[in-house]
A protein has these predicted regions:
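Active-site Tyr-X1-5-Lys
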Residues: 1-24, 50-51
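Flexible, glycine-rich beta-alpha linker
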Residues: 24-42
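Short-chain dehydrogenase/reductase
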Residues: 1-9, 39-43, 65-66, 96
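Conserved hydrophobic/aromatic "anchor" residues
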Residues: 1, 15, 29-32, 66, ...
């Protein structure tokens, strides 16, 4: 998976150099929102919370940089208005949270005592333990993450419930 991403970026850079094409690559970190699919961790938790206070997850100590969909859309708008040369932009909130911390936030928002059942067999051996975005380049174009994690999680709960 990671290899195909790198290959795609190398191919894009080659096209830029060979054909003088303006190309912008957007690396989106852990995007979430109210209409996200349940195979992603945040909507998965919300769906499980609808039926029970027991949440079944894999590795709850993995840390991810969660970014709300409206911030991603705003990043695309800015990037599309600034395509010049070859650029790679990272889109993320620049802060990581563990899955356990996300569950604690949902516990507070829902008012339910959450019981986490972690199954380490669901953990992928190649998973990175801590992922944090560096959005410095994108911020130079005037972008910033506007949706706090707490507000974003609340929006997800309100839509899914």
């Amino acid at each position: 998976y990671a290899g195909s991403k790198i290959a795609g970026e190398i191919l894009c850079e080659s096209y830029h150099k060979q054909f003088n094409m303006d190309i912008s690559i957007v690396r989106i970190f852990s995007v979430y929102g109210p209409e996200s699919n349940n195979h992603l961790v945040i909507p998965n938790i919300v769906t499980q919370l609808k039926n029970s206070n027991i949440i079944k997850l894999g590795n709850i100590n993995s840390r991810r940089d969660f970014i709300f969909i409206s911030d991603v859309i705003n990043a695309f708008r800015i990037i599309l208005n600034n395509i010049n040369g070859f650029n790679v932009y990272n889109v993320g909130a620049e802060k990581s949270y563990s899955i356990k911390e996300i569950c604690k936030k949902f516990e507070k928002l829902s008012g339910k005592k959450i019981i986490i059942k972690s199954n380490l067999k669901q953990t992928r051996k190649f998973d990175v333990k801590n992922i944090v975005c560096d959005a410095t380049k994108l911020k130079k174009l005037g972008w910033k993450s506007k949706m706090s994690l707490d507000k974003g999680l609340k929006k997800c709960m309100n839509i899914k419930n």
